[in-house]
Amino acid sequence: MAQVQYYGTGRRKSSVARVRLVPGDGRIIVNKRDIREYIPTEALIEMVKQPLVLTETLGSYDVLVNVQGGGFAGQAGAIRHGIARALLEVDPEFRTVLKRAGLLTRDARVKERKKYGLKGARRAPQFSKR
């Protein structure tokens, strides 16, 4: 018999994470590597686990993630978003908890483009009166 799987796609900055939740013992596998091997900082790992902690499902699902694009912080945010969306498929009752924590909202903040005539997105060249 086929195993039950729940899917969710998360995005943050330029990262996209495709997340699968499978009943298991709480392992988190990112791009075929353990999360502790893949993500360098403990703070980002805790951020990824946040939806599971809030819904009290931390030890009951294995999380299989395929993530592309961006850096570690963007990828961690995308994984968190994907896990939150997948948990909605597990139980729609989780929506209120996840929504209140802001985990279902796509964080739309991205780097502003550099404009010509300026040194950065907004930083202007030094002004000289004389």
UniProtKB/Swiss-Prot annotation:
Q: Which Pfam families match?
A: Ribosomal_S9
GO biological process, alphabetically ordered = translation
Q: Which SUPFAM superfamilies match?
A: Ribosomal protein S5 domain 2-like
Stored InterPro entries: Ribosomal_Su5_D2-typ_SF (IPR020568), Ribosomal_uS9 (IPR000754), Ribosomal_uS9_bac/plastid (IPR023035), Ribosomal_uS9_CS (IPR020574), Ribsml_uS5_D2-typ_fold_subgr (IPR014721)
- Keyword tRNA processing applies: no
Gene Ontology CC terms, in alphabetical order? cytosolic small ribosomal subunit
Ordered alphabetically, the record's keywords are: Ribonucleoprotein, Ribosomal protein
Q: Could you tell me one molecular function GO term of this UniProt entry?
A: structural constituent of ribosome
Q: Which NCBIfam families match?
A: PRK00132.1
Stated family: Belongs to the universal ribosomal protein uS9 family.
- The name under which this protein is listed is Small ribosomal subunit protein uS9
Give the classification, highest ranks. Bacteria, Bacillati, Bacillota, Bacilli, Bacillales
Q: Which gene encodes it?
A: rpsI
